[in-house]
A protein has these predicted regions:
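Metal-cofactor-binding active-site regions of metalloenzymes
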Residues: 1-202, 211-216, 222-227, 232-250, ...
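Conserved hydrophobic beta-strand within the GNAT/NAT acetyltransferase core sheet
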Residues: 204-206
Length: 374
């Protein structure tokens, strides 16, 4: 039975919303607004035509992680061109800004859009980057991108994604990711692509240790990731926890998503507090807001009410998230006067804050309207 701490008052909620923070674990396709999913779907006469947002909210109830992964593909189906990617990025930034998010690294499964619908890489990244530029101008949120490979696809496809990451570095791409169903598909299957990208300066930030155990985390650590998506099942093996500590790896933990997909049966069983107490670096992420009903702030609330985090812990977690941002994501981004972030610890290069102008090299965005596809 989950323990519940009362006291999430409006004052505390407002305080946490005001903490400058980074969102480092959110999937673009899983962060569409329900109305946008329906709008894009109706445009193409898709599977949700004629259904409303209430039905959509009730629709996504998952039997297990694999069931979730199957339903997730629904969210990728509605993207048809660069304008759809731009719209999704702009709207996500609009949703993140009131939650105190000043910087976001957003994961996009570009390889899925390419394989399933034939979208060229340049159209995908043009839409993402146009959205990032509009988001900066409109919401003040700095958005960068992780292009993830899907484990069900081949090692050759992963190499293609790695090549795209290198090509996209000047247009907001900061890392290679790895997602999808973990069991039987460890990170080491994609070693060639990961190492090829690393040789060209692209870091690897895979999901590991969510649907698979501590061994998946150990396997991923072979590639020296600065962060791991989820990773909390490292707690099953003290030696793996020690490895996280030795390397300073940050875990992007998403409590609501872990509960919804059934990888934890009850938040009281979630090991994130134990890991943090051991000294493991932890940040919180909303993962897939559309599918889980999560936000950046709900994860902070879950941590407070169910995972034993104090208000001071939440503030420290917000600071940690800024310090865990990837260096490539923040050139030209400056400290806001009066802010005491990011922390100087962990070798964070330079000051990071809100960019005061569109990033150097940003493309003109007037040709991509966020309201309709072209």
């Amino acid at each position: 039975m989950s323990t519940h701490r009362p006291g999430w008052t409006p004052e505390l909620a407002a305080h946490v919303a005001g903490l400058p923070k980074a969102e480092l674990h959110v999937h673009l396709e899983g962060a569409l607004r329900p109305a946008t999913l329906l709008d894009l779907d109706r445009r193409d006469g898709g599977r949700f035509t004629g259904l409303d947002e209430r039905w959509l909210a009730e629709r996504f109830r998952f039997r297990d992680f694999r069931h979730f992964a199957d339903l997730y593909s629904t969210c990728t189906d509605v993207f048809r061109g660069p304008a759809d990617f731009a719209r999704a990025v702009v709207e996500l930034a609009e949703d993140l800004a009131p939650q105190g998010v000043r910087y976001a690294e957003v994961t996009c499964s570009a390889i899925t859009h390419h394989r399933d619908r034939g979208l060229p890489f340049d159209e995908i990244v043009d839409g993402l980057w146009a959205g990032a530029c509009q988001a900066l101008d409109g919401s003040g949120v700095v958005v960068r991108f992780v292009l993830d490979h899907v484990r069900d696809l081949s090692a050759e496809d992963c190499l293609r994604t790695a090549e795209w990451c290198v090509r996209g570095r000047g247009r907001g791409v900061v890392a290679l990711g790895l997602g999808g169903y973990e069991p039987g598909r460890p990170a080491s299957l994609f070693a060639e692509a990961v190492r090829w990208a690393a040789e060209r300066g692209v870091p690897f930030v895979p999901h590991a240790g969510e649907a698979a155990g501590a061994g998946a985390v150990r396997d991923a650590l072979r590639f020296d990731p600065p962060r791991l998506g989820h990773g909390f099942r490292a707690a099953e093996d003290p030696a793996v926890v020690d490895a996280l500590l030795d390397r300073g790896v940050v875990l992007e933990v998403c409590p609501t998503g872990n509960l919804r997909t059934g990888v934890v049966a009850d938040l009281a069983e979630h090991p994130v507090r134990r890991l943090r107490d051991r000294g493991v670096r932890v940040v919180l992420g909303s993962d897939d807001p559309l599918l889980f009903g999560s936000t950046a702030l709900t994860e902070y609330r879950q941590a407070y009410e169910h995972l034993g985090f104090s208000a001071d812990d939440l503030a420290a977690t917000a600071r940690e998230s800024l310090g865990a941002a990837l260096p490539d994501g923040v050139p030209g981004v400056v400290r806001v006067p009066g802010d005491d972030w990011p922390p100087a610890a962990h070798g964070t290069p330079g000051d990071k804050g809100v960019a005061t102008s569109r990033p150097t090299g940003a493309p003109p965005v007037g040709g991509i309207a966020t309201g309709q596809s072209r």
